[in-house]
Amino acid sequence: MDYMALSAAEWQQEYDKVSAEYESWKAKGLKLNMARGKLSKQQLDLVSGILTALTSAEECVDSGVDARNYGELKGLESARKLFADILGCKTSQVFAGGNSSLQLMYDTVSKAYTHGLLHSEKPWCKEESVKWLCPSPGYDRHFKVTESFGFELITIPMTENGPDMDIVENLIKDPSVKGMWNVPKYSNPDGIIYSDETIERIAKMKPAAPDFLLMWDNAYCIHEFDGDFVPFKDILSECEKYGNADMVFEFASTSKVTLPGAGIACFACSEANMEYMTKLIGIQAISFDKMNQLRHVKFLQNKEHTLALMKEHAKILKPKFDMVVETLEREIKPLGIASWHTPKGGYFVSVNTAPGLAKRTLALAKEAGVVMTSAGATYPYGHDPLDSNIRVAPSLPPVEELEQAMAVFCCCLKLAALEKSKK
């Protein structure tokens, strides 16, 4: 049944049917949440061993460094090496910090704003205007960071291979364009992997701004839930190859590997950037939580062992993602009112409805007790120009709750589409 081709009588019959289904869902008083990519209790239980990874004072010493004490601003050598092995860069290029990669990202932009970067002519706060490129749909918290500094956010359409590089390459001719957000693997929310060609074009860019900042958030670098680990290019060496070693800062964390909010995070950059940034960071901090870094090193051990843990996460996640996609295929695909990308990793399914349906769909879902990411959140300033993108986060609810939530969501999308196409 194609909703766009219904006769008036067919529309009324379908509308009455879907409306009745919606009212029955509302009557159940559900309280379900698909708003954020949180880990389920089952996933958190996988890493309970990290709580007892350190049990004696002797175990707190790592390569001669007592993790209980001050010092080692750039993090424990072993933690830096673990991240370097995962990211494919050098240990000397890694700064291991606290629990939040978002905080490290904010701090990097903040330092550019207040002090300037290595190749800045002046702090960005003294620039007449600062513009920032935002591949969209993208991560709402990225956009909020750059919006909070008053930057002008420019939407860059996403393709199946990553951001539209023709548009990017044209825009960076403007010296006021200072940077770009990226989630290169299993992008949030589309689950797209940047192609090798896209990565090469990004690495070889020649922005007019000498201090252009490529923010490379590799949040889902080892987060496959369908199939084996997919290797990825080391953006640091790619940029260095094209004379852009100082252009990029890469970020990662264990937030969806161990404990969200109690993991460890890092940034990776050129040695020259490392020297510049550690001088600034050394004013605000003496060291980060090395005890937690050491707990993670003891628990995760190395890249191979970490990938084995991610396979255990995948066993929990895959049935949930399969169920979401199967429900969409069964309930929505025949109606011609939405499309989606089926990801093999990451934490989201991105649904693109027919124009003008996202806000209404999510308002109906909220009334029926299903909370989801706000409409528009995946675009700069919270404004989706087509009002069509909806981010589904399947990871937190148990499967039985997720089945209910998806049934409600599909019902709401149908109702919104029928309202829009009223005969």
Please identify what each model-predicted range represents.
Residues K311-V325, I337-N352:
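Conserved glycine-rich beta-strand-loop-beta hairpin in the small C-terminal domain of fold type I
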Residues S350-P355, M372-K414:
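Conserved PLP-binding active-site segment of the aspartate aminotransferase-like
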Residues T361-E367, A405-C410:
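Short amphipathic alpha-helices in soluble, non-transmembrane regions
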Residues E59, V65-P210, C221-G243, A358, ...:
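Conserved core of the PLP fold type I
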Residues D2-K74, S78-A79, A84-D85, E367-V370:
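N-terminal "arm"/small-domain region of PLP-dependent enzymes with the aminotransferase-like
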Residues N218:
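Walker B catalytic acidic pair
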Residues S237-K318, L418:
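Conserved core segment of the aminotransferase class I/II
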